[in-house]
Amino acid sequence: MFTIKEEIANAITHGIGVLLSIPALVFLIIFAANYGSAWDIVSFTIFGVSMLLLYLSSTLLHSITHKKTKDILEIIDHSAIYVLIAGTYTPFLLGPLKGTLGFTLLVIVWSLALGGIVFKIFFVKRFILLSTFVYLVMGWLMIIAVKPLYASLSGAGFSLLFLGGILYSVGTIFYIWKKIPFHHAIWHSFVLGGSAAMFFCVLFYCVKVPFLS
């Protein structure tokens, strides 16, 4: 259970995410339309919508006190983490890694995401450590394709991708370390940082942007 102050901090941190995700989605679509293909438009949109879904569901969860509504939002919020992970993968797998490897990984991560969502529907308040472990495994599955990714993204793009992964991963420490005051808001802050790194990586390096060439 969170204190009132903690819930306010939880809502504010991801409320900021909602406000940033809306223009982020617009920029993603514009860049994909101007510099990418139809597949890039689809994949960038999926990524942007997955960010917005995560931050919106989280903000609502921490803002509403009605128990039944909160229980439903908790399922959506936890499920949205799986969606964000798979959504973040999508621009890379349909862009820089497109082909057999990209398609295979795409099927794997979205299958894991769907499995995770079904799991959360039934066990949202249980097996937290297991869920966190699955989040991390899904997130770092990309290491399978580290060589072609580095070749496609360049050093700067790959650094942003790696930074995003590190921020998300370090943040999970505070997600499960419940004895620290405001631990959940701290985790939210790491999620924001991870999303920012992934956003700029996708925006500038998953399509060929002329002014960075």
Swiss-Prot record:
GO molecular function: pore-forming activity
Record's keyword annotation contains Membrane: yes
Family stated for the protein in its record: Belongs to the UPF0073 (Hly-III) family.
InterPro entries recorded: AdipoR/HlyIII-related, Hy-lIII
Keywords: Cell membrane, Membrane, Transmembrane, Transmembrane helix
Record's protein name: Hemolysin-3 homolog
Subcellular location(s) per record: Cell membrane
Species name: Bacillus subtilis (strain 168)
Pfam families found in the cross-reference section: HlyIII (PF03006)
Keyword Nucleus: no
Superkingdom of origin: Bacteria
GO cellular component, one term: plasma membrane
Spans traversing the lipid bilayer: 11-31, 41-61, 75-95, 103-123, 127-147, 157-177, 185-205
Record's bilayer topology term: Multi-pass membrane protein
Subcellular location, principal: membrane
